[in-house]
Amino acid sequence: MPLAAAVAASAVVPPRPPPPPPRRARPLRSFTGLILTRDLAALTVARCAPSPPAPAAEAEAEAVAVDEAPPAKPRPRRYPRQYPGEAVGVAEEMRFVAMRLRNPKRTTLKMDDTGAEEEVGDGVSEDASASEEEEEEEDDDDVVEEEEEGAGLEGEWMPSMEGFVKYLVDSKLVFDTVERIVAESTDVAYVYFRKSGLERSARITKDLEWFGGQGIAVPEPSTAGSTYATYLTELAESNAPAFLSHYYNIYFAHTTGGVAIGNKISKKILEGRELEFYKWDSDVELLLKDTREKLNELSKHWSRKDRNLCLKEAAKCFQHLGRIVRLIIL
């Protein structure tokens, strides 16, 4: 009986289920990181999102405004003005200065190589010509007398033996100074012009000895010659291009206007005697051409400022030479 009761009781009570597995809790930091990551992603997406397209009407208005705007004009390119004779060399530029001094009232000249007309005043820069304008006007007559073919000697000049000897004395001082500087200077620029064949100092000495043998007194150099010689000496030490401008123009003036003056003086007061001052051992035109070519080649290495200074000094050279020539009639 008791056994039967126990069996019945066991059949009525169900068995207990097994306990559930234990739950594992995730750390709080993982949950926080997940939230932060989601927030940053949302911010990034919001910041990089493309802006909404503009309305079609606004886009068309902008396109029409762009089409109606005038095109920008290109800025004009400025080229420096070329001086008359600049393509040939500084000696050619100085020739235009001489022509301007010889013909102060003329406004245009014809270029020999191109046939194009150029203003004579263009041969000197504004800086070079402005400071010399008044002096050039005062000494135009002097420059004309010395520069070309002795124009105006007939009927205007009354040369004297005493005045001509003074002219030779001052000329000798100028040529002595120039030739001494070129021969003794250590400046490389002057070396090219040594023994050019144009030298005049020794020949003038022979002429002055002849005048002394004729009983004619040979005076000391005048103020005009001494002033110019001093100026040349100082200039040679400070600026080679400026000095070479005087060097070339002194010989240029003598081989052109100087020879013409000598011929007329010889006929008037020397009974046709030809002086040594006007003689050369070879063709003087070739000698002057060789000197001119050397100067042009050397001037290729000069700045425009140096060339303008040469043009300014060329005008001064003709002024000084004009004062010396006037000694003939004083």
From Swiss-Prot:
Which GO cellular component does the record give, naming just one?
chloroplast
Q: Where is the protein found, in the record's own terms?
A: Plastid, Chloroplast
Transit peptide residue numbers? 1-47
Concerning CDD domains, the annotation shows: HemeO
Composition bias (Low complexity) maps to: 1-13, 56-69
Supply the alphabetized keyword list. Chloroplast, Photosynthesis, Plastid, Transit peptide
In its UniProt record, a GO molecular function of this protein is:
heme oxygenase (decyclizing) activity
Region (Disordered) residue ranges read 1-27, 50-82, 107-156
Any one Gene Ontology biological process term? heme oxidation
Q: In which broad location class does this protein mainly occur, judging by the first location in its UniProt entry?
A: plastid
Classification via InterPro entries:
Haem_Oase, Haem_Oase-like, Haem_Oase-like_multi-hlx, Haem_Oase_decyc_pln
What start-end ranges are recorded for coiled-coil regions in this protein? none
Classification via Gene3D superfamilies: Heme oxygenase-like
Q: Name one Pfam family in it.
A: Heme_oxygenase
List all Acidic residues biased stretches.
Answer: 114-151
The UniProt similarity line reads:
Belongs to the heme oxygenase family.
As for what it does, the entry says: Probable inactive heme oxygenase that may play a role in the regulation of phytochrome assembly and photomorphogenesis.
Q: What is this protein called?
A: Probable inactive heme oxygenase 2, chloroplastic
The gene that this protein is the product of is HO2
